[in-house]
From Swiss-Prot:
Protein name: Peptide chain release factor 1
One Gene Ontology CC term in the entry: cytoplasm
Positions where N5-methylglutamine occurs in the chain: Q235
Matching HAMAP family: Rel_fac_1
Name of one Pfam family that matches: PCRF
Keyword Ligase in annotation: no
UniProt-listed SUPFAM superfamilies: Release factor
Length: 359
């Protein structure tokens, strides 16, 4: 890992020289790229300095502990060593994660689709809980969220919820949320106190950049229908034909949007989702053809694959793909997802590039 850090520090010096060149401002695209790289490398530098300083303090405490005789000071030093070892482990993992080579698509916005699966009303309620969890996580990362479509259930929660999320490294941290999320808990309507199991399916679709030439949709291939939007239970919320349904005839992909009162806005949102789904279908097709890469993925990313279990009675969350079990489900549901998403990103990196690169 030290070799990687030294390479990054050397590159940071080069980037700083390039950014300080007044001529760089004549090329906004290059300046933007260098600025992002500078921010990433600076974060690595700061993390490395924190790790080195913490290791030094730990080393000093251990040295003092080896010669100290006073029981009170010994106890204090032992506590310091324990805290120091935990800090070194945490900072090492943080630095290791920062050293993961960035994917060109890491900063792509994503469209996240959550749907109630088995479990009826309880599944719909858990969709609502997951929506809240992802909104809190996004807020903690400084990301922006936008509701694209929402279909409420009769008892609260959502039958389906589609949102766009944008910001730095959105795709990197959210791409492995795709799959089936299983929940085990006692529903509020359960009078016997029995634990019920229900499920929510999640799809994460990277949103194509505006200049992405891979996604081309011919207007001739689209069928666009308009109709009156309606709320939960079929109650009309708009007397005009503002809702939009777009069908991509070649692929059969259908997208409906009725959240906005403007037909134009609903069409724009539906087109965003349509493009993301078509792009995702192409990516999935290529991934299936590249069998070597598939073996290194954290699961298939298929929404039918059970990836995680949320057990509320035990306050336990388990990610089945990497065998990670945590007993702080309450914190996870409050948006503290980094402990899971970071572990997944690190696992994939080790699988693809080998542990020796970051060890």
């Amino acid at each position: 890992m030290e070799i990687k850090v030294l390479e990054c520090l050397k590159r940071l010096e080069e980037v700083e020289k390039q950014i300080s060149d007044p001529n760089i401002f004549s090329n906004p695209k290059e300046y933007s790229s260098l600025s992002k790289e500078h921010a990433r490398l600076s974060e690595i530098k700061n993390a490395h300095e924190s790790l080195v300083a913490t290791k030094k303090i730990l080393q000093d405490d251990k040295l003092a502990l080896s010669t100290e005789k006073d029981p009170e000071i010994v106890a204090m030093l032992e506590e310091g060593v324990l805290v120091g070892e935990e800090a070194v482990e945490r900072l090492s993992k943080q630095l290791e994660n920062l050293l993961i080579p960035p994917d060109p698509d890491d900063d792509l916005s994503v469209i996240m689709e959550l749907r109630a699966g088995t479990g009826g009303d309880e599944a719909a309620l858990f969709v609502g809980d997951c929506v809240r969890m992802y909104h809190l996580y996004a807020a903690s990362k400084g990301w922006q969220c936008e509701v694209l479509s929402a279909s409420e259930s009769d008892l609260g929660g959502y039958k389906e919820y589609v949102m766009g999320i944008s910001g730095a490294s959105v795709k990197r941290f959210l791409q492995y949320e795709a799959g089936t999320h299983r929940v085990q808990r006692v529903p509020e309507t359960e009078t016997q106190g029995r634990v019920h199991t229900s499920a929510v399916t999640v799809a994460v679709l990277p949103e194509p950049a505006e200049d992405d030439e891979e996604v081309f949709i011919d207007e001739k291939d689209l069928r666009i229908d308009t109709f009156r939007s309606s709320g939960a239970g079929g109650q009309h919320v708009n007397v005009t034909d503002s809702a939009v349904r777009i069908t991509h005839i070649p692929s059969g992909v259908v997208v409906t949007c009725q959240d906005e009162r403007s037909q134009h806005k609903n069409k724009a949102k539906a087109m965003r989702v349509l493009k993301a789904r078509i792009r995702d279908a192409e990516v999935q097709k290529r991934a299936q053809e590249a069998s070597a890469m598939r073996s290194a993925q954290v699961g298939s990313g298929d929404r039918s694959e059970r990836i995680r279990t949320y057990n509320f009675p035990q306050n336990r969350v388990t990610d089945h793909r990497i065998g990670l079990t945590l007993y702080n489900l309450d914190r996870v549901m409050e948006g503290e997802l980094d402990m899971i998403t970071t572990a997944l990103v690190t696992h994939v990196h080790r699988q693809l590039f080998g542990h020796e690169e970051t060890a």
